[in-house]
A protein has these predicted regions:
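Acidic, divalent-metal-binding catalytic cores of TOPRIM
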Residues: 1-203
Length: 203
């Protein structure tokens, strides 16, 4: 009698992307399309890439990092949005009456405004767009205005926060806790999906 080791079942290939979209078999990244998405904040851009990166590559949509909303007017002018060249922008902490909302309104009324969509999330920081349970919290801590939010949050979590390197490691820990779109708050999910739909809609 010949004994053979039992065969382990081969895991099925993932059928969905991290954003929940159906993964097309053999889908490859497209050549960059004319439409583009700018994301304010480095951590914001990294989170968008980690969850929606597969979808964006298939659509050929390039995501650019926006250093600050004050640069938005210049970027719109340089990009030159049009019917076949749409521009989407995700802005940090976009709430009524804020500087961000005034700049977004000026862009909407300006040249190329009808082909530009500026949306935003309501969070003080993109960290809050990750469901707090992913880092063992029931809710994100309330940090006094006198304390920088990231430092105050790390302190509440008992994480090191002495310098920027500590903050970077804290963000990596939070970002790595995100498995897919279900670990994010709907206020961010809806805005990113809205931007992707806007810049990829057919002429």
């Amino acid at each position: 009698m010949i004994l053979t080791a039992p065969r382990r079942p081969v895991p099925a290939a993932a059928t969905r992307t991290a954003s929940g979209s159906v993964k097309a078999p053999g889908a490859r990244a497209r050549v960059a399309a004319a439409g583009r998405i700018y994301v304010e904040g480095r951590h914001d851009a990294e989170l968008v890439e980690s969850v929606w990166g597969d979808d964006l590559r298939v659509e050929g949509v390039v995501v650019e990092y926006l250093g600050g909303v004050d640069d938005l007017g210049r970027i719109v002018d340089e990009f030159g949005p049009g019917p076949t060249r749409r521009l989407g922008v995700l802005v940090d902490h976009l709430v009524p009456g804020s500087k961000e909302s005034r700049i977004a309104e000026a862009v909407r009324r300006g040249p190329g405004g009808e082909h530009t969509l500026v949306v935003g999330h309501p969070y003080v920081d993109i960290w809050q767009a990750v469901k707090p349970a992913r880092v063992g919290l029931s809710e994100w801590p309330t940090v006094p205005r006198t304390i920088e939010w990231k430092h105050g949050t790390c302190a509440a979590l008992g994480w090191p926060h002495r310098d920027q390197a500590d903050i970077a490691r804290a963000w990596q820990r939070i970002r790595d806790s995100v498995r897919d779109w279900t670990d994010l708050e709907p206020e961010l999910i809806g805005r990113v999906e809205e931007l992707i739909d806007f810049v990829t809609q057919p002429v």
